[in-house]
Amino acid sequence: ALPSIAAEKDTRSFEMRTYYAAPGKLDDLLARFRDHTVKLFEKHGITNIGYWVPIENKDNKLVYVIAFPSREAQAKSWKEFGADPDWQTARKASEKKGKLLTKVESVFLNATDFSPAIKPSAAAPRVFELRTYTTTPGNLGRLQARFRDHTVALFQKHGMTNLFYWIPMADQKTADNMLVYLLAHASADAAKASFTSFRGDPVWVAAKEASEKDAGGSLTTPDGVKSEFLKALDFSPTK
């Protein structure tokens, strides 16, 4: 059976944030989250979904996903968090020897209607794969239909765990052309084996051909499929 698809539409506002730590500062950044930020998020009505770092972390990155009841709640929670004296104290203490971050990226997301229920889960040791697709013009709907009708079930058939699927909110610059999702695998090698068998599946081949025939070409841009393997952090609710 497929994982429980949310019975009702998940109307929460999600935010995926990517932090780039200054050289030598990633451990300090993670300590600040572990000791302070995660708890303070909860205090201010922010739901922690998951925290990860790339397995090959050349850019000193932290990737995390949080959730809010609504976009309005999002703005209110961030404002209150930023003004919290406990946060200000923790931030100052952590930056005594210099700033921890060089860059922050953020995208506001909605759950797709075919995403499994977005809630933290912990399983046997596993690796995560963050995949981002950029579609050709006008084809985000077709890409979602292909996932809804075929891909999600085929991923499971070939040993992958479907976790979360999102598209950017309407006011985000990638709203018309991006799908972001997270899978889990037993290992990076298992992921490779799963994708090899998935791509050779006649059901997938037929679904891909039919969707591309309907669109008059590929649903994704050249170089429009990005994949990054992640490992969950010790303080991540999803691990």
PLM segments and residue spans:
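Short S/T/G/P-rich N-terminal loop/turn motif that feeds into the first structured element of a domain
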Residues: 2-89, 93-206, 210-239
